[in-house]
A protein has these predicted regions:
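An N-terminal, well-structured beta->alpha segment
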Residues: 1-65
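Short coil/turn connectors at secondary-structure junctions
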Residues: 9, 30-32, 61, 87-91, ...
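A generic local structural motif
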Residues: 20-24, 79-81, 120-126
Length: 169
């Protein structure tokens, strides 16, 4: 086993009705533009979309939607989200859904403020950036994890981005 340091300053809110109870008060900690990221239509059919949009609108947030995140999202999909976040000066990414949405948004969070392709960065020796867009996951029936796994060109990008900005593959 290699020596390492793990620091986790993450708050996790649990419970039925947690989105309604906690999301509104947490939004005040971030700027005005929120990227609402989700997969298919299940969040609309279930009513989650309307609840979340109601909370965002009540908080006076400008919402940029990033939808159709598929199961096992592609790296290209994450890059599309990063471009959208960058162009709209997103202050917070709100990922609503399961593990695929969460994984995609972790890459978006890291890539949006970079000039260099994060995929290429894993093959170079350098100091990784520490400026990420804050990410809030509203996970539905999925465990939370700080690791993001992406199928890619010829390999898999396994991003483990911690507050210190370190990534492992």
């Amino acid at each position: 086993m290699n020596n390492f340091i793990f620091e986790n300053k993450t708050k996790v809110y649990f419970g039925k009705g947690g989105v309604k109870e906690y999301l509104g008060c947490l939004l005040g900690n971030y700027g005005e533009t929120v990227m609402l990221a989700y997969g298919g239509g299940s969040i609309k059919r279930s009513g989650v979309y309307d609840k979340v949009m109601g909370i965002l609108n009540a908080a006076g947030k400008r919402v940029v939607e990033f939808d159709r995140i598929m199961s096992n999202p592609t790296y290209a999909k994450a890059q599309e989200g990063a471009k959208l976040a960058r162009e709209n000066h997103v202050d917070l990414i709100l990922a609503v859904g399961g593990g695929s949405v969460s994984d995609c948004c972790k890459v978006i969070s890291a890539q949006a403020n970079l000039d260099e392709d994060i995929w290429e960065m894993q093959y170079k020796k350098h100091t990784l950036p520490t400026k990420f867009i804050p990410l809030s996951n509203t996970l539905l029936f999925t465990p939370s994890s700080c690791i993001s796994v992406f199928p890619g060109r010829q390999a898999v990008l396994r991003m483990d981005c911690k507050r210190s900005g370190s990534c492992s593959r």
